[in-house]
Amino acid sequence: MFLYYENKFEIRPNENPKITIIPSSIADKEEILNFYAQELYFPEYFGQNWNALYDCLCDLTWLPQNQIKIIHNNVTLLNDEDQKIYLKLLDDAIISWEGESQHQLFVYFPENTKDQILEILKSPIF
């Protein structure tokens, strides 16, 4: 369940969250995996693949912040298949934290991408 914003400055930090802004220039799987590994301080065992990204987003025990906010400036420039996997992975990671108190994961996209994202999430991965 993504959150959508009109103006990213509307996203107010509270409780000292870890805020990560995904650069608009990220264009492939390797770049986005490396970005997450650096920004969220993934452990050395991070496997540089989609499953490893999901596993780390569902753990996050190494981060001192309770809230993690991932803010996108646009829908990623990944190829169609990777984009589907990435969005579904983020959605599943958010759901995995529901009802948990250890961490809260919030993922934001611009409001004008909502229809596109919902359409992507409806389509099968393979």
Regions found by a protein language model. Give the residues of each.
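Eukaryotic endosomal/vacuolar membrane-trafficking regulators centered on PX-domain-mediated PI3P pathways
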Residues: 1-46, 50-126
